[in-house]
Design a protein with these regions (language model features):
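Topology signature of small-to-medium multi-pass alpha-helical membrane proteins
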Residues: 2-154
Length: 154
């Protein structure tokens, strides 16, 4: 398979600068996936939200759009200048989202806004798991980049 189109494998060996860079940029893809899921949820809240929640629709949608914009910008920053800080932040954010979703499922509450289809929760959960894996790979890649950079300086 052509390495240029191969997806990043978060648990692959980091044995070269190219592999480390590809893994670190995988974290940027995770932020962009996160932004896409956030925009999907914003659209669903706006168009399919429960009528009794209409007064909160604008704020909820705006909040989701702002967070999607933040995630897209973080992805751009991680793509241009891969570092270790953003994958750690992404890991923490993904773990928080997954734990909040898990707790709401355990207590029997709806993990999504009222009136949204059940499949949207599945898409968001799958997206968060994918983001978590890509951020793990991003952290490993950024650490490898730092290691290779310090080895080249010495």
């Amino acid at each position: 398979m052509n390495r240029r189109i191969a997806p990043p494998q978060p648990f692959a060996r980091v044995d070269s600068t190219e592999t480390a860079t590809a893994l670190a940029r995988g974290s940027a893809w995770a932020f962009w996936i996160w932004a896409a899921v956030g925009l999907m949820q914003a659209g669903l809240v706006w168009f399919l939200g429960a009528p009794e929640q209409a007064e909160f629709r604008g704020a909820t949608t705006g909040f989701a759009v702002v967070f999607s914009g933040v995630a897209a910008v973080l992805g751009l920053v991680q793509w241009r200048r891969p570092n270790r800080i953003l994958p750690v932040f992404g890991l923490a954010w993904a773990l928080y989202e997954l734990s909040a979703m898990s707790v709401s499922l355990m207590v029997g509450a709806s993990p999504a806004a009222p009136g949204l289809p059940v499949w949207s929760v599945g898409v968001a959960g799958a997206g968060m798991v994918l983001c978590l894996l890509l951020h793990i790979g991003g952290l490993r890649g950024a650490t490898g980049m730092a290691r290779f950079t310090s080895a080249n300086r010495a």
